[in-house]
């Protein structure tokens, strides 16, 4: 959704974009299967929402990693065609990664191969996200912009959420 905001330092309006999306941890502080149970519930509700003609959700961005599609479809393979249709119709964005990387643990080649694998899976579903979606690492490696550009991505979502910081002047 596109929103206009006033900018007190300029006559031109600021334009902000709101993209419904999710960040999904496959395993963090709970075992994988507990997260998968939550994933199944989430995706079931998401598919129903995106298929509902009366829904206000024009589209949804699914986390940037394709491995969650595999996790879901291992349990509910009958929904593959529903997901493919939503991807092809531009209602569900998938990829470009196979799994969201921790950039400081792996090297540049691993990042490229991760993207290549994610591209292949995304395209099997009918398309891929054209944004370098990496919102949750503990920083970004210096070569990431070149890697993203090298695979044809010119936009980068580098963090999620916005803090409530207020300067001394208020």
Residue spans for each PLM region:
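Catalytic-domain carbohydrate-binding cleft regions of carbohydrate-active enzymes
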Residues: 1-170
């Amino acid at each position: 959704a596109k929103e206009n905001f006033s900018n007190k330092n300029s006559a031109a309006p600021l334009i902000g974009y709101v993209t419904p999306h999710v960040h999904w941890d496959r395993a963090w502080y709970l075992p994988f299967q507990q997260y998968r149970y939550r994933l199944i519930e989430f995706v079931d509700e998401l598919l129903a929402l995106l298929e509902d003609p009366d829904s206000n959700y024009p589209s949804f961005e699914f986390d940037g990693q394709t491995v969650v599609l595999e996790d879901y479809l291992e349990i509910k393979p009958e929904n593959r065609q529903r997901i493919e249709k939503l991807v092809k119709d531009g209602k569900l964005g998938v990829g470009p990664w196979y799994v969201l990387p921790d950039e400081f643990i792996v090297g540049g080649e691993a990042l490229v191969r991760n993207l290549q694998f994610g591209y292949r899976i995304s395209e099997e579903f009918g398309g891929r996200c054209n944004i370098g979606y990496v919102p949750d690492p503990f920083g970004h490696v210096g070569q990431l912009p070149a890697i993203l550009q090298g695979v044809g991505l010119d936009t980068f979502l580098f963090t999620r959420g916005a803090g409530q910081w207020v300067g001394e002047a208020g």
